[in-house]
Amino acid sequence: MAIVTLLALQFTSPGPTLVEIGPLSIRWYGLLIASAVLLGISLSSRLARRRDIDPNAIADLAVWLVIGAIPAARLYYVAFEWQQYASRPAEILAIWHGGIAIHGAILGGTAALILFARRRQIPIWQLTDVVVPSLALGQAIGRWGNFFNSEAFGTPTDLPWKLFIPIDRRPLAYIQSEYFHPTFLYESLWNLLLCLLLIWLFRQGLRQRLPLKAGVMTCIYLIGYSLGRIWIEGLRTDSLMLGSLRIAQMVSIVAIAFGVLGLVWIYGLKRSLPDVVRPAISGESRSEL
């Protein structure tokens, strides 16, 4: 009973706007994205030091990632929801109203990262490995934007941790239902655990307890995030669809395949590759991670 009482957290969004100053307004979504970027830069910079990557390059990379990821995330979403934007093309630019797709962001961010890595002559897999923990952390933070916007929620539920959705935000099929699965919370917690797992793997490799090679953390991210997304996407009421199939689930299955094949390639076909996480230098604090 005590556990049920502890988990009895009814979530109700205060609205998408944090504060309004005259004609200007600061929205929760924007604040969360900015916070995710700053925290991601800090985390990846710390990891980069142990991968012999200039930590100052991470801040430069962040600019490239934002430029590549956010427009791609929006365009990905709009492409699969074109019917609602065809008659309102100006709304395509209104990203503050919500409507971005993480898979689009990953595709756009990956393209930007590859271009950046080649320009700076940084090994791509080394760079992706120090970015994916921050990506998972950023997703954990960013999902709360869905909460404030009352979007990307699940099917109706009476669970103690239910999410209240205003009537004007409910799907027509569930217009009489007040409470829904807080899928934003599920994915936020899943991504936070994934971030902690990736950092733990990095530390284990740093201490030479695991033969961590370039690309392993990237593959683990692809597998870990996608497994959670397949489950959570099945609960959502607003999935992007291709016929009767949920696009996010299909993309996640492909990502899992890439992750598994990547691990086989790294450890099976490339056995001569050296371990790439260097041990801590004498006098260098492990607390940096």
Curated annotation (Swiss-Prot):
Q: Does the keyword Membrane apply?
A: yes
Keywords of this protein's UniProt record, alphabetized? Cell inner membrane, Cell membrane, Membrane, Transferase, Transmembrane, Transmembrane helix
Pathway field of the UniProt record reads: Protein modification; lipoprotein biosynthesis (diacylglyceryl transfer)
Q: Name one GO biological process term.
A: lipoprotein biosynthetic process
SS bonds (residue pairs): none
Q: Which InterPro entries match?
A: Lgt (IPR001640)
Molecular-function GO term, any one: phosphatidylglycerol-prolipoprotein diacylglyceryl transferase activity
Q: What is the top EC class of this enzyme, as a single word?
A: transferase
Lineage, top-rank taxon, reads Bacteria
Q: Transmembrane stretches, by residue range?
A: 21-41, 53-73, 95-115, 122-142, 182-202, 215-235, 247-267
Q: What does this protein do?
A: Catalyzes the transfer of the diacylglyceryl group from phosphatidylglycerol to the sulfhydryl group of the N-terminal cysteine of a prolipoprotein, the first step in the formation of mature lipoproteins.
- NCBIfam families given in the database record: lgt
Q: Output this protein's name.
A: Phosphatidylglycerol--prolipoprotein diacylglyceryl transferase
Q: Which organism is it from?
A: Synechococcus elongatus (strain ATCC 33912 / PCC 7942 / FACHB-805)
Instruction: Print the organism lineage.
Output: Bacteria, Bacillati, Cyanobacteriota, Cyanophyceae, Synechococcales
Task: Give me the gene this protein comes from.
Answer: lgt
